[in-house]
Amino acid sequence: GLGDVYKRQKYGCINVHASLLPAYRGAAPIQWAVMNGDEVSGVTIMKMDEGLDTGDMLTKVEVPLAADETGGSLFDKLAAAGAKLLVETLPKLEKGEVTPEKQPEISTTEYARMIKKEDGKIDWTKSAVEIERQIRAMSPWPSAFTKVNGKNLKIWDAKVIAMFGGDLFSKIPGQNPTKSAGKVWVADETGLHVKTGDGILVIEELQLEGKKRMKTADFLRGYAIEPGTRLGE
């Protein structure tokens, strides 16, 4: 069995995992760290066993996340950090200078399941902060997406300009967050200002199906999106 293969090696089989284990065991630790708004990620060099990312930990290094970190940029950072750490760890392991540390049974975060294309679909009833993180986490794949006038629209860059700490639109007569979520409030050279379940999100870079990726201001010169248009339909 696989366990026998691991045991036959002098030092076992070594894995480079893109999280600070036991957090984010699983296939997509990078995207989930960005999605959850973590400020720090990292790499763990670990011994493999028959479980999924449950083997003994050998060494770790922390890597801070930038405020505009994407899934792609964090992948690059962790790949570089992991390669450096692996090269440092292997000689120490051979000399007996590394003490394997058992992982706790329970992880400090949810299992980092594999990302599917559907994870990029935006739910406008979520807060602007959550959606902005989703957009960054899903870049470059599968990309965050919605619909506008029945066409698929990828969203590449956005920023939160207002958070209300509650349901601002429910306090306006005839409005509530669920009904107004996804509605374009402003469409001009500053971007598409979209109402969310909590707050306003400004879409600054996008890509309509069949078109190239572009700044929203440039896009709006050739494609009209009227205020009141609801995204996601």
Spans of model-derived segments:
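Alpha-helix N-cap/helix-start motif
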Residues: 23-27, 124, 212
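Active-site loop ensemble at the mouth of alpha/beta enzyme cores that anchors a bound cofactor
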Residues: 112-114, 119-130
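Glycine-rich phosphate-binding loop
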Residues: 1
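Short, flexible active-site loop motifs that bind/organize anionic cofactors or intermediates
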Residues: 64, 121, 209
